């Protein structure tokens, strides 16, 4: 059982599924930038959350409902929760998550919605059979059944998420065109500069080689992290351009 102090955002489940490095940058290093896709999504969510609540016939609708599960260690906010009146007078929750794009081929959105349902079940003490995903591009609802397989996958991902965050290690960047080019953190993550098989030391060495092509190849680059003592300076007749002397345009 978790406590209020170590609850993690429900949205982190989607980040972890999409890209572990993205999840680490956001939830371990607290890095966030927006692009047109995230901005459009934020505007959509803000509009939905600001509507309060309403009742139409046998359906009560709550917007921006706060959610929490101490069992799963999650907290968040549902875009919409419809409460459908049953024949026995019980109002059964039906979560609806809004997404700006179109249905995905993976389970990221379904897992996030299922996590909301699991939070509601713990809060309300009632079983929730289904919910829906509404996509802004298609303007269509996609019904989602919370079957045993989806529930098990969601709960397992919650355990993995907490272990991942507690480890506190940000994975190295690996460029994936289909994911990276749409990610708002592309300019921070720099997957093309620091991908698999690449290191900051090698990258820095290449930059120095480009600026000072005559520098002896055996010269060492010493970083602040591993430099306990600096090596003796070597005399060199090669001069590197300095922006302080006006050598740079």
Regions picked out by a protein language model, each given a short descriptive name:
Residues 11, 202, 239-242:
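Intrinsic-disorder/low-complexity peptide segments enriched for small residues
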Residues 19, 170-216:
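Cysteine-cluster motifs in flexible loop/terminal segments that predominantly coordinate metals
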Residues 1-95, 99, 206-211, 223-226, ...:
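Metal-dependent nuclease catalytic cores that hydrolyze phosphodiester bonds in DNA/RNA
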């Amino acid at each position: 059982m978790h406590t209020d102090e170590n609850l993690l955002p429900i949205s982190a489940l989607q980040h972890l599924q999409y890209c572990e490095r993205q999840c680490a940058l956001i939830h371990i290093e607290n890095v966030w930038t927006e692009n047109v896709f995230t901005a459009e999504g934020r505007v959509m969510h803000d509009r939905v959350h600001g509507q309060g609540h309403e009742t139409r016939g046998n359906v009560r609708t709550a917007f921006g409902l706060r959610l929490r599960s101490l069992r799963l260690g999650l907290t968040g906010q549902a875009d919409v929760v419809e409460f459908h009146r049953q024949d026995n007078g019980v109002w059964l929750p039906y979560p609806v998550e809004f997404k700006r794009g179109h249905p995905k081929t993976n389970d990221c959105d379904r897992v996030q919605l299922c996590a909301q349902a699991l939070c509601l079940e713990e809060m309300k003490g009632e079983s929730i059979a289904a919910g829906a995903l509404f996509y802004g591009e298609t303007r269509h609802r996609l019904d989602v059944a919370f079957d045993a397989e989806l529930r098990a996958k969601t709960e397992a991902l919650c355990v993995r998420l907490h272990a991942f965050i507690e480890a506190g290690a940000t994975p190295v960047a690996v460029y994936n065109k289909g994911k990276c080019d749409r990610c708002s953190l592309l300019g921070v993550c720099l997957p093309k500069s620091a991908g698999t098989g690449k290191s900051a030391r090698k990258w820095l060495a290449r930059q120095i080689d480009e600026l000072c092509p005559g520098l002896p190849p055996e010269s060492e680059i010493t970083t602040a992290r591993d430099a306990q003592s600096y090596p003796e300076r070597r005399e060199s007749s090669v001069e590197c351009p300095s922006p302080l002397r006006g050598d740079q345009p």
